[in-house]
Curated annotation (Swiss-Prot):
GO terms for cellular component: ribonucleoprotein complex; ribosome. Keywords: Ribonucleoprotein, Ribosomal protein, RNA-binding, rRNA-binding. One of its GO terms (molecular function) is structural constituent of ribosome. GO terms for biological process: ribosomal large subunit assembly; translation. Belongs to the bacterial ribosomal protein bL20 family. This is Large ribosomal subunit protein bL20. It comes from Mycoplasmopsis pulmonis (strain UAB CTIP) (Mycoplasma pulmonis). Binds directly to 23S ribosomal RNA and is necessary for the in vitro assembly process of the 50S ribosomal subunit. It is not involved in the protein synthesizing functions of that subunit. Transmembrane segments: none annotated. SUPFAM superfamilies: Ribosomal protein L20. CDD domains: Ribosomal_L20. It comes from the Bacteria. NCBIfam families: rplT_bact. Gene3D superfamilies: 6.10.160.10, Ribosomal protein L20 (1.10.1900.20).
Length: 116
């Protein structure tokens, strides 16, 4: 008698369809298309985990630059001055200070200006 392996096949297909739950159209119903969509989504997820770091760094830099320009400096001059003054504070914290604690940020700008 021929063994068709129905339960194993059904379980495997069910696993892929469960991963594709919430996808639009045939991507959540059809096994082959669902499997392709899930694998593609993993590719996007891998790529975007790297990109999110770049995007946040860009955001922080543009925020710092926007906060430092009215105080008479450019971003690069500000960062260079902080490095010369041996102030070790990362860009994330600098951008948060620029948004929430403007007085503290202005103090850092004055430190950066004086260290030239």
């Amino acid at each position: 008698m021929r063994v068709k392996g129905g339960t194993v096949t059904r379980a495997r297909r069910k696993k892929w369809l469960k991963l594709a739950k919430g996808y639009w159209g045939h991507k959540s119903i059809g096994y082959k298309v669902a499997k392709q969509a899930v694998v593609k989504s993993w590719t996007y997820a891998f790529r975007d985990r790297k990109q999110v770091k770049r995007n946040f760094r860009k955001l922080w830099i543009s925020r710092i630059n926007a906060a430092v320009r009215p105080l008479g400096m450019s971003y690069s001059q500000f960062i260079n001055g902080l490095k010369k003054a041996n102030v070790k504070i990362n860009r994330k914290m600098l951008s948060e200070l620029a948004i929430r604690e403007m007085k503290t940020f202005e103090m850092l700008v004055s430190i950066s200006k004086s260290s030239k």
